[in-house]
Amino acid sequence: MLKTKIYVTALLSFAFKIMFAQSVIQVSHFDKVIVSPHIEVTFIEGNEEKVIIENSTVSEDKINIKVNGKTLRIYLDDAKEVDKTETINENGNKVKRPVYTGTVVSATVIYKTLEELSVRGEETFVCKSVLKGEKFRLKIYGESEVYLNEVSLEELRTTIYGESNLVIKAGSVKEQKYIAYGESTVNSLAINNNTTKITVYGESNFQLNVSDEIKLTAYGEASVEYKGNPTITKGLHFGEIKINKID
């Protein structure tokens, strides 16, 4: 009897996951995406715009997928901007706990065009397709891991708040601009780049491959390792700056 109950429970759990794996939400046109905490997303270019829920530990009615203007927002109830807490009784004491912990939803976003991406939380985000165009804006909040598999851009503007990690794996960007608040890490050694402008508030590390010029302004501690033969231009800086060429 016990084995039967365990089997049924496992079967129901599996069926629950399969149901979400088959959950596809068609959406209207967008070119900007905002992802809130506890949601892990992979971005893929395609012929139709939709969101696929690959896996979830909450019921579907708690997952919000909305397009306003040309902005797609994906968020959970009680975690649109930041985590909310709930009060529970624990051994006779009232204790506040976050509504969600860890990654709750894994999703895939299929887009036609993507010009701006804003992510929040501690999840992993992967742009699998080539990001191409005149300008791409990236905003990272929290302790996220962001991977851009390939880029072909005239300009990449990135703002990082927190202790996040950005890796760009291949391609080219004519002009990079970074503003970093906190202890972020950026690795774009694998791409071709003409100029990079960096403004740091805190402690950030950059690994770059630049041909023409690196401009650096730092209010804190900044570390820059680079390949290429760019001119190094230092603006205002308070704190320790380390700039090293990689052979």
Predicted regions and their residues:
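Short, surface-exposed interaction patches in beta-rich subdomains
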Residues: L166-D247
